[in-house]
A protein has these predicted regions:
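SAM-dependent nucleic-acid methyltransferase catalytic core
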Residues: 1-14, 21-22, 66-149
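SAM cofactor-binding core of SAM-dependent methyltransferases
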Residues: 20, 24-91
């Protein structure tokens, strides 16, 4: 299963090479979850995940506990995938004026450059625009991710 987000340094393309070396386990622990490619490939019965980025944690909590509401909030960005809208929304977030940070994270991850969520020294997101991408093509992947978390 694929992850609903991209993540710089993710292991989606490499897991086929090291999966056979993962020992049997009762509890899967992922201290730096990021995009979660390994977990979504394994889909363990029990797992503990963590990350040091509060937006990543907020996003995955919403995927797990409230995926339909998250999808509904993401859908509000569907007609805002052009370059001007992207920079306007990014600036609103940096001013603390975005109400659904989980949906914003998905938006910036998918519309921003290469899934990178980059911050400047002030902690503001400054990820450049990548291009317009249909966000709704990820809704079923979000649902699948929810079932695996």
């Amino acid at each position: 299963m694929k992850s609903s987000i991209q993540y710089l340094g993710g292991k989606a393309n490499e897991i086929k090479y090291f999966k056979k070396y993962i020992p049997e386990y009762d509890l899967y622990v992922e201290p730096f979850f990021g995009g979660g490619s390994v977990l979504f490939d394994l889909c363990p019965e029990k797992a503990i995940i963590n990350d040091n980025d509060k937006l990543v944690i907020k996003y995955w909590k919403s995927v797990k506990y409230d995926s339909e509401n998250l999808i509904n909030n993401i859908s509000e960005y569907e007609n805002k995938i052009d370059k001007d809208s992207y920079y306007k929304i990014r600036n609103l977030y940096n001013k603390g004026k975005v109400s659904h940070e989980d949906a914003f994270y998905f938006y910036i991850n998918r519309i921003g450059f290469r899934g990178l969520v980059r911050r400047n020294k002030k902690g503001e997101i400054n990820t450049p625009y990548r291009g317009d991408i249909k966000l709704n093509k990820y809704y079923n992947i979000i649902r699948q991710n929810s079932n695996c978390l």
